[in-house]
């Protein structure tokens, strides 16, 4: 990759100079990039953030993350405010090439924290758009296309391989989308309650109605008023299912379920996972698990 060396990257050997190191900001970017660079020699993909509890907005860079970043030629991020944890350090890597996967994609206005009452105290992330783009299969396909196009531009010697791999992966995602539409388009009960603002793009794509969201943060709990409001919505709309996420505690959901008789299910927005060779199909696998969960939860 000509002219794409990070000024903070050490050149220890000829071998290291010949290897293109791509770093992804978090797991969904890692899965997409892994598929795009599949079987291309001298191109490695490293994921920076580790599996965690809570929202990526609250992530703090570790010493290991900074070392990984210092060895990167290209950094692939979701963008749309998702990687705010990079804001204070990214200027130190002036020659690092950054690919923003969500660039040019139509985004949904962020309603996160809007319904929070004054007594629910935590830091406002102050984002104008919802960053959870990849949770929509269609928009994830757009992100894959964007990544492949930018990689092809930055590393033209492998452009054909990037595009070929991207097209193969996109075909799999298109099949997944068709499978999910064939089931979810015919579900009668489409009102859902979620416990984080991760699913607006998914809901928009598959015609689900998010009638209530209760925010869960690692260092705080929703206010009593927020919980009461959600309980009122559940009773008013006869909601039978509450959807939590695997990276958050289900404590509040358990309380609401006891009050309303609703059942608790888990939907995975695929924010975290193990960054290894088994990750290639993890997006598809977890989306199929989400489909099975929705079929079970909304069949009444």
PLM regions: where:
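Extracytoplasmic metal-acquisition and chelation regions
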Residues: 4-300
């Amino acid at each position: 990759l000509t002219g794409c060396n990070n000024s903070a990257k050490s050149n220890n050997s000829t071998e290291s100079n010949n290897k293109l190191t791509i770093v992804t900001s978090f797991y969904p970017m890692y899965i997409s990039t892994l598929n795009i660079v599949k079987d291309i020699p001298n191109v490695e993909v490293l994921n920076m953030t580790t599996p965690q509890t809570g929202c990526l907005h609250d992530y703090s860079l570790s010493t290991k993350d900074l070392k990984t970043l210092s060895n990167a030629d290209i950094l692939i991020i979701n963008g749309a405010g998702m990687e705010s944890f990079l804001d204070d350090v990214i200027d130190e890597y002036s020659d690092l090439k950054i690919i923003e996967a969500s660039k040019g994609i139509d985004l949904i206005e962020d309603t996160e924290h809007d319904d929070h009452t004054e007594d629910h105290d935590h830091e406002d992330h102050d984002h104008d758009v919802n960053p959870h783009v990849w949770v929509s299969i269609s928009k994830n396909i757009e992100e894959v296309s964007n990544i492949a196009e930018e990689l092809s531009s930055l590393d033209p010697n492998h452009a054909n391989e990037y595009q070929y791999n991207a097209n193969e992966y996109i075909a799999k995602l298109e099949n997944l989308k068709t499978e999910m539409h064939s089931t979810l388009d015919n579900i009668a009960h489409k009102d859902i309650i979620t416990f984080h603002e991760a699913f607006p793009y998914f809901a928009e794509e598959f015609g689900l109605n998010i009638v209530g969201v209760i925010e869960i943060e690692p260092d705080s709990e929703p206010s009593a008023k927020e919980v009461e409001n959600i309980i009122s919505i559940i009773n008013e709309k006869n909601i039978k299912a509450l959807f939590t996420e695997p990276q958050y505690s289900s404590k509040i959901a358990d309380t609401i379920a006891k009050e309303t008789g609703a059942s608790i299910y888990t939907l995975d927005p695929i924010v975290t996972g193990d960054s290894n060779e088994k990750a290639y199909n993890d997006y598809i696998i977890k989306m199929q698990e989400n489909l099975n969960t929705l079929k079970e939860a909304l069949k009444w």
